[in-house]
């Protein structure tokens, strides 16, 4: 299909490594504004039988998500402790898969909570720290491997 001048188009970047599991019953997605497009893509691949809880970190950005009656959206404050407290208050069914993407200071305590407090197995958690407050892309890239290793060590992985 050809695009004509004046047509609206959407451009997508490369996809991530996570694919929605076929047997997923419940998805917990925790995301800041930067990660909402990834959450939207994940919701689009969610099986019809699955439910989702989206914890949307409060921001001034309002990215449209494909919401249905199977999706619940909860807003969390921007601070990492507030995000974890919001998730602690959720009743998560068995076979929950977690998709946590956003700023590094949010991702680290969420991993700790999901692995150590909730007992979610590593293979049911997908985390990605997209950015690190106060660092540019090169600065974040320079320390990201060490950051990921320290998160693994913290949660016994």
What do these predicted ranges mean?
Residues 1-157:
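Extended, composition-driven regions rather than compact fold-specific motifs
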């Amino acid at each position: 299909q050809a695009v004509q001048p004046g047509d609206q188009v959407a451009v997508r970047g490369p996809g991530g490594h996570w694919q929605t599991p076929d047997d997923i019953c419940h998805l917990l997605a925790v995301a800041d504004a930067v990660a909402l497009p990834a959450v939207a893509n994940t919701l689009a691949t969610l099986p019809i039988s699955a439910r989702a809880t989206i914890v949307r970190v409060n921001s001034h950005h309002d990215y449209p998500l494909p919401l249905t009656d199977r999706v619940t959206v909860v807003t969390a404050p921007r601070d990492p402790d507030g995000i974890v407290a919001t998730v602690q208050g959720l009743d998560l069914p068995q076979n929950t898969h977690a998709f946590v993407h956003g700023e590094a200071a949010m991702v680290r305590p969420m991993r700790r909570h999901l692995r150590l407090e909730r007992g979610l197995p590593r293979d049911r958690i997908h985390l990605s720290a997209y950015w690190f407050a106060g660092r540019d892309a090169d600065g974040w890239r320079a320390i990201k491997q060490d950051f990921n290793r320290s998160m693994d060590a913290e949660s016994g992985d």
